[in-house]
Amino acid sequence: MNNLIKSKLELLPTSPGCYIHKDKNGTIIYVGKAKNLRNRVRSYFRGSHDTKTEALVSEIVDFEFIVTESNIEALLLEINLIKENKPKYNIMLKDDKSYPFIKITNERYPRLIITRQVKKDGGLYFGPYPDVGAANEIKRLLDRIFPFRKCTNPPSKVCFYYHIGQCMAHTICKKDEAYFKSMAQEVSDFLKGQDNKIIDELKGKMAAAAQTMEFERAAEYRDLIQAIGTLRTKQRVMAKDLQNRDVFGYYVDKGWMCVQVFFVRQGKLIERDVNLFPYFNDPDEDFLTYVGQFYQEKSHLVPNEVLIPQDIDEEAVKALVDSKILKPQRGEKKQLVNLAIKNARVSLEQKFNLLEKSVEKTQGAIENLGRLLQIPTPVRIESFDNSNIMGTSPVSAMVVFVNGKPSKKDYRKYKIKTVVGPDDYASMREVIRRRYGRVQREALTPPDLIVIDGGQGQVNIAKQVIQEELGLDIPIAGLQKNDKHQTHELLFGDPLEVVDLSRNSQEFFLLQRIQDEVHRFAITFHRQLRSKNSFSSQLDGIDGLGPKRKQNLMRHFKSLTKIKEASVDEIVEVGVPRAVAEAVQTKLNPQETEILLQVAEERVDYQTEGNHNKP
C-alpha cells in the first residue's frame, strides 16, 4: 500500500457509493459498490485475502470514490461504470450475444421472420430461443402450416414458396388483411402452447386426403402432426399458467459464484443461461450487479415476471428490471427457483471437479514423476528430439513444460551446424552442448529434468555432455518408442534401466504429451527448413535474383509450384525485371522452354526453306 492510498483511506466517508480501483497506468481495473465506503474500501488493504483478491490488491495503485444517496443508486451507478469501462476484475458476461426471437411483423400483410432485436414496432415477438437453430426449426414448422407472405414480388409474379404451398401470394390469391391477421392470431396461440386446435385441423385434413386417395398429402399432414409432437416433448412444461418468466438462482463456494437463469416461455422451459465468475463483495451484492448487467447488456425481452431467491433485495431488483419481481415462498414458482439454485450448485461443483482433474494431470503428474524417479519435483522439464531425412537439413528442437503445461515461449529450434550426414548421436551432442553451455554462460534457469526422445545411446551422449563436459547435475531420462512410434518405455538411472511406469498413470500421460509435442515441433521445423532449402536451391544461380527478390516471390506466390505456374508477366508484376523473370521460368520449367525453342527452330527452318524455293 503506497502513501497516496494511505492518505485517501483516511478521507473516506461512511456514505453509500461506488469505489474505483486503478492500476499503475491509471486504468480502471475494478468498480465496486458499498453501503459504507469507508469500511468496504479499507477492507481491501487489511488482513489476508484469497488468491484472486490478492491479485487484485497487488495491482491497485490509486482509487477514487463517488458518493450516492442510496444503496440502489450505488448499484445502478456501478452497473453503468462497469459497462463504460469494462474493468478486467469485474463480472463480465461471457459474451454480448443476443438470443433469437420469432416475430410476426406488424405489416398490412404480415410476415414470419427471425430477429435478434426486439423493438416497440407493433410486431408480435416470441422467445427468446436458445439458438438460431432452435428458432429456425420452429419457423420451418410454422411455414409448413401457415402460408404467410414471404416475397416482395410485383403483383404479376409469384415466388418459389407459392409453388410449394408456403406463401399465399396475396396479390394473386386476393386474400384480405383480415385473413392474415387471423392467421397471425393462430400462430400466436400455437406458440403459446395452445396447439390442440391446429392438431385437430391437421388430423381432419389428413383423414380427408386419405379418403380421396391423396396419400402423399395425407403423409405430409401426418409428418406435421408428428413434428408438433416432437416440439412439445422438447419444451418441458414448467408452469400451468403459460406465463413468460425468467427464474434466477445462484450458488457460491470457494470464492466463486454461479448464476443460472431459466427462460420460461409460455410455461415451457426453453433454455438456460449459465455464468461462473469470482466474486469480491458480498454474494448478494454481486448477484445484483450480475442481474443489472444481464438486462442491460443483452438484447433481452423482459418477461412478465422475474423470480429471485429469498435472500435478494426485492426493491433493488425492481430498480434494475421493469417487470414484476417475485420471491416465491411456496408452490410451483418456489420449485423453479430451487431448481435454478440446484443447477447453479451442480455447475460450480463440476467446475471444481474439473479443476481438480486438471491439477491431477499437471501438478499431480510431476509430483508423482519426482517420487518415481526419486528426484525433487520436476517443475521445469526440457525435452529434445532430432529430425532429418537421410542427413538432409538436420535439425533439433527443444520443448519446455512448466508445472506440467507447455511453456511455448521457451521452445527453441536448432539447425545442426557441425554434423555431416545422418548421425543422430553427434546431432544430440551438439544441441545439448549448445543449449546447456548457454545456460551456464548466461546463468539461465536450468531444468529439473531433461527428457531425451530416444534410447540408451542418445541418453548416454546427453549425460556425457551435461555431467563430464559441463559439470552440471541435472537428471536425464530417455523415452523409447515402440515399432508403432508410440511412447513405450522410460529409461532412467545409472546405469540406465527401464522404469516401472503404469500406462494408466497421469505421469505416463504427461511424458506421452511431452514426447508427442517435441516430435511435432521438431518435424514441423524440419519440413519448413526443407521447403525453404528446396525453394532456394532451385532459384540459385539466376543472375539478378538475389535474396530480396526471392523473398518477394515467395511472399507473393506462397509456393514454388505457384511460381512455376506463373507467367513471365505475373512475375514481372512482383518487381522482377523481365529478363530475370524469363530466366526464372527457364530454370523452373526446362522442358517447356526446350519445347518452345524446338518450335521456334522449326519455324525458322520452315521460313528458310520457303525462301530457297522462291524463283
Curated annotation (Swiss-Prot):
This is UvrABC system protein C. One of its GO terms (molecular function) is DNA binding. It comes from Streptococcus pneumoniae serotype 19F (strain G54). Keywords: Cytoplasm, DNA damage, DNA excision, DNA repair, Excision nuclease, SOS response. Residues 196-231 form the UVR domain. The keyword Cytoplasm applies. The lineage of its organism: Bacteria, Bacillati, Bacillota, Bacilli, Lactobacillales. The gene is uvrC. GO terms for cellular component: cytoplasm; excinuclease repair complex. PROSITE patterns: GIY_YIG, UVR, UVRC.
